């Protein structure tokens, strides 16, 4: 509010309206002008309503006594002092008066707030009143007043205290009889409650009877007071408002009223003229108590809502004009209202006389409107009661909307229901009582009139009452003296209404009061005059203010002044809400103690102003006394008997005592409440003082802090300035340094750029120079490459020419050698033919002879054995070559034996003939072309049918590695194949021997032989059955002449040599026979004693099974110079010479020594030597021993008999692996289908007596098909064969070169 007015003040200054500023400012709270100054402890600066500044000292106590305030106000003393602006004392007095009025209106609010703030225990402490406290209060109350009324003791000789004590005891005993648990506190609370209820009843009684007395009685009662008429009217209004039910409180209950309900009231045409902002207060709980929640909700739903609360505030100008017009029409409206009474009084006679409804309703409606709207107090009370009891509002709405049809029907039904006799009795009693209590100054009603009136009642009470009312209205000159009969009639009419449609009895009483006010329109001249006076003063002041602020703040001013205009009504309305709250608490189910607390608290407000002003207390007391005992006072003044007991009976005295006790209790409670309020206010003042002191201390500290902060800020500012200077200086220095660095960096960058330019130019020059050098170097390299290519091409051409030349020479040489070989072969063939003839002859001679003791058995005769001479020559040639290879015969023997053992191991270890290796140094490819040509010529010069035993192509070329190059035999051996075919067993040649010389010697030796002496005959003419079975039997392959170290006794050397062998084969397309490895080669592919499936001959003496065998002339079985017997003798003599003690002699030594004893050395070969030793077993007891490798190494002859002798070489002692190996070999050889016969005849030689004791087996390819022919013949005589697979013990074994 203050800020809003300040803004208006500023706007006024801008417009230059300085004169309007003083009128616009109204009440403004005191405020401190200088906020920065220290808080004043003894005074405060305020601003007056006219805008002047005043200075006042702080009040020491806010709760000053009202008497002091009144004295100060009357004396005109003010606590303000003028300021420099020249403020006058008149302004101070006006401000004090305004403050005093505000304080008077704030007292009930303060007490209400204080009572609500108290706790339950504090309320109980206030309500706890003992008997002693009560009587002390009565004594002090009597001593304070020197009144001679009946309550205070009109006779001094009477002991009023004792009488009151007796009354108190009687009342307490009666209360104890009702409730035995009642104590003094509960008794006092009940008295207060009864006082509350009795005050309402007294108010109703006074409204019906007391106020209808002569006005002189009221003036006499008012003459008992010492104050002026204004105080009398104020006290009267205060007393009336204290005993009336109070529905409104300006500070508390008004906030609880709903705006919607107020807006709905403002829309009603009956009460909208009397509606004021803040004068209407409604609590919904009151309606709930009287009507129930559902009915209240239904009533509230029918109330229209109003969105604008400001519509309830009327324009003041219009209100003033309306007020004036209402005053002028008051008399006429009251007269009109009285004329409307007879129709209401005729309600009981509705069955007899029924008036016009339209006329009656219109008159009643007009009467209600005018009465309610004409007088402010009636309208205000009617509004309050309408809000408290919604049925009144409903009746009013029915009168407004339905023209009173519902009310009329209700009244008629209620009146007709009442019994006529009860109505008569009540009317008679009321009339007698009114006549008795009538003022003597009033005219006395005659007995005849009363009798007639009584008779009229019997006959037609309504008609009589209507006639009396009309008569009284006509005779009355003014509203000041209404007729007693009329009042009695109205009272009797109102009392006759039962109001059964209202549940609450209080509501019934309120309705009766409302109807009484409406029908009687009793006189309130004094109140109206007082209101007129106040309204005139307010009106004058409002006119001045409206004229001043008409254009600026009319709305604000109207609200403020409207609140001030209602201040005079707060005495009558201040506690309405409190008593309503009390009624609510009484009816809402609180406990008795809480109900009593609220009732007593409501009663305390009745005498608030009496305590505020000590001078008003006796006035109020006498007012109450005279109101309660007005009839008694009048009687005493008129000369009635002074005896108190005779005047009042015991019941009246008891009632008076009850009232006095109730008043005393109320005063006592009021005193306690005020004391509690003062204590609380004192506590608040102390707290506020402490808070102010604390605030002052805090303010001082805050100032000190501000000073310190200011100093710190200054210091900080200086420090910041100093830092800024230093920072600026530092920044300048850094700027200089930065500029220097930038200059240096620019210089460095310039130099770097210049250096880069120089380097770039140098780099470009270097690149150019390097490119030139690279180009020159590339050209030189290209020239050098071209030169080298030319030289390389030239060298290649030269090499090609040289190779061509060499090849040409080689071909020429080979051609020459082949020519020579052919020539030699032709010569040899001629010799062979000749030798064959000789051998045939020798074979025929020796065909029937057998050598006993030789295990070879007999040899069948063969007509083709005439080539023995040729065989002997060839055998001698081989012996010569063997001698030339090694000087030690034992070495050859050991090699031969090792070869046979290794062959046997090869068969046991899963090896075959194809896995045999020979040293590469001994291959035929490394032989000289001349030697190879000699061998090739020798083989090619023979006829195919005659050279089958020398050169047979194997059927399984893949098995013997046919893709490998051919190899040649060792020097000193016969060529084993034609055209470079390989041998199965390679010779272990000594690397120290010159192979070329040996081959040349062998070639020259063969030239000298008589190989061409062989006579060739037709092989087809020879029958197959004439073949020698020995020749047909297969023989194991031997490598005797393929091993140069035959007499080497070292088994490790033999094994190592055997592991280094390798076979290379080069098949010849023109030949289909397997080449022979030696003259004893029978082919490893065939089984011993079984004819080959590919028509291989078993040896050089055998022939294939498919063709007649031609006699082989390789060796002869007889030597021309020496016989077998001579060999045995030579060997025996040699043994005796070497071992006189009959010990074992090495075989090689024996063989070498025996050769020296024989003339023809070429005749005795090592195999013959072994055969001879074997044949000497029986004749000379020969014992042969094997070495660690299983070869024959030692021999012993002599008288020592052989314990077991040599094992019989039968077919049971066969080698276990021979058959398996032969079968695997036979399986591969059988693939060859072309039979090739051997044209050579079988010679008779030293090997002719050797027969293989092998059983003929079939190959896997011919399983189940045994080969016919000689196989059966061989198997038929097992005694003629030697078991070469026999394993001999280490102590004694007999073997040969194949074992």
Curated annotation (Swiss-Prot):
Stretches assigned to coiled coil: 675-847
Main location: cytoplasm
Feature: compositional bias, Acidic residues: 547-573
InterPro entries, alphabetized: MAP7_domain-containing, NST1
Origin superkingdom: Eukaryota
Alphabetic keyword roster: Coiled coil, Cytoplasm, Stress response
Location of the region described as Disordered in the Swiss-Prot/TrEMBL record: 1-104, 200-237, 324-347, 446-486, 543-573, 694-816, 834-868, 960-981
Localization, UniProt: Cytoplasm
Signal peptide residues on this chain, from the entry's feature table: none
Bias kind Polar residues: ranges: 325-337, 844-868, 960-969
A Pfam family this chain is assigned to: NST1
Bias type Basic and acidic residues, positions: 18-32, 64-75, 467-480, 711-816, 834-843
Gene Ontology CC: cytoplasm
Listed transmembrane segments: none
Keyword Cytoplasm applies: yes
Bias (Basic residues) ranges: 1-15
Composition bias, Low complexity: 76-90, 971-981
Protein task: May act as a negative regulator of salt tolerance.
Record-stated family: Belongs to the NST1 family.
Protein name: Stress response protein NST1
Originating organism: Kluyveromyces lactis (strain ATCC 8585 / CBS 2359 / DSM 70799 / NBRC 1267 / NRRL Y-1140 / WM37)
